[in-house]
Amino acid sequence: MTELRALNPFKIKDRLQFIEPYTGLCSGKITTPHCTGEFFLQGGHLTSYHPLDQKHPILFLSDQSQFATSKPIRGGIPICFPWFSAHPSDPTLPAHGWARTHLWELVSSSMIDDDVQIEMRIFKEPFELNLVARFGRSLKVALSVTNRSDELYSFELALHTYFQVSNIANVHIDGDLRKCPYLDQLTAVEHPAEDRPITFQQETDRIYDGKATDIRLVDEGWNRTIHITAEGSESTIVWNPWIAKKKRMADFGDEEYLRMCCIETGNVRRRAVPIAPGETHTTSMKIHSA
């Protein structure tokens, strides 16, 4: 557990303050001339990003999320690491790995022009993870993984970003995913690239394969386009639980599937990253809206 007083050196007057909104969970509240934001040390988890020129937040956060120690937060940008979804060989281990439920250390906070930048870190053998997030007119997130051992390892990761939308019926995804083949995780069937926008009429769980450096989430209901620019990523996961699955999720409201979709930047399955001793791999994304 991190005590609030231990975070005092990282405060930035009128820009970054710390609170304990839930027992045992500390968060940082960010205010800049261009946005507001929030992050939790548990999970190295960004939970809010709201540009001030937008009526609605960019990130979705479930009203039913369980804010408790060692519990994942439903929404924002969870970090899936070092495996994605179920563990490949041990079903007793938690889905999406350990990074999203462990306590991270705040390493630094600073002002860059009008932006607030924070860095969080966690070490669990053999990996050291560093997350740098910059809040401003855009949200920039970079996750670096370093192998601190003397052996070769591999890992999966995903920045499991939940986007808030007006209504799932009003949105489509366009851009580089048009040219990417995908695995439908619901049917285990692989599909060739379809060269058309992605829309939602049912539960959707797809892993798109290949570099997708420019993705657009177009929301006709809010007349808004969210741009996602990714680097160091060979996988993009598109997900919405729809009606039946959300009923099995205790931390997800009955109608919340209508107000969100996930577009996840990462490296999973066949794109798992081999990493030699001492090497560092960085996956990053930039989110901005227009």
Language-model-derived ranges and their functions:
Residues L152-S154, Y162-T236:
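Active-site/ligand-binding surface loops and adjacent short beta/alpha elements
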Residues I58-A99, H227-A250:
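Hot-dog-fold acyl-thioester-processing enzymes
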Residues E20-Y22, P91-G136:
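Extended, loop-rich substrate-binding clefts of extracytoplasmic carbohydrate-active enzymes
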Residues H102, T199-I275:
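Acidic/His-leaning functional-site neighborhoods
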Residues A68-T69, N130-V132, R270-I275:
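Beta-strand-rich interaction surfaces with strong enrichment in secreted/lumenal proteins
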Residues M120-F155, L159-F163:
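Acidic, contiguous internal or C-terminal segments within carbohydrate-active enzymes
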Residues T2-D14, Y22-K29, P72-W83, H87, ...:
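Membrane engagement elements in two modes
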